[in-house]
Amino acid sequence: MGFKLYARNYGRSAFCLSGGAGFGYYHLGVIRELLDRRLLPPIITGTSAGALMGAIVCTRTDEELRQVLVPELANKIKFVHDSLIAHIARYATTGAFFDSDQWCRLALWFCRGSLTFKEAYERTGRIFNVTVVPDDPHSPPKLLNYITAPNCVIWSAIMASAAIPGVSSRHVSSMYVCRLTGPVNPSF
């Protein structure tokens, strides 16, 4: 009992996936290699694009990962869908370069739909941590996982983690929770 308490209070090693769309492809290669060597850590932490890549790991079993993490996956991952002119036009009308709806659709696929942190943990045994920055500049960042936000829908946490002013719309920074009975609802 004492060691479990220490591990929870002092923490354990985690595989940290940084943000930045370009890193996403590299993250997947490292994840596949760790999986093949049976060295994939049980704790994954991600921010922005790194959270998107972490979701693919933490919502799937090892066998499912072996089927999904194939070279053809690179064709599914497109962080930029539109021309530069379309991005500039969107920025002029919405204040964001990227289409949040396209990002949501991509995040839904990576997260296997609207799984919550708790559901993903129960399904895979992996602990998935996503860091988000609150709207209040004086508030510290939040760490979301199956302990701190068990009913938070993972795709919404990823969208909030990637919500950078001028890059994506601010409405994506709303996180959603799955009620025990009923639909997914805005929360935080």
Spell out what each predicted region is:
Residues 51-59:
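Short glycine-enriched nucleophile-adjacent loop
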Residues 45-46, 50:
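Gly/Ala-rich beta-loop-alpha elbow adjacent to hydrolase catalytic centers
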Residues 1-44, 58-188:
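Patatin-like phospholipase
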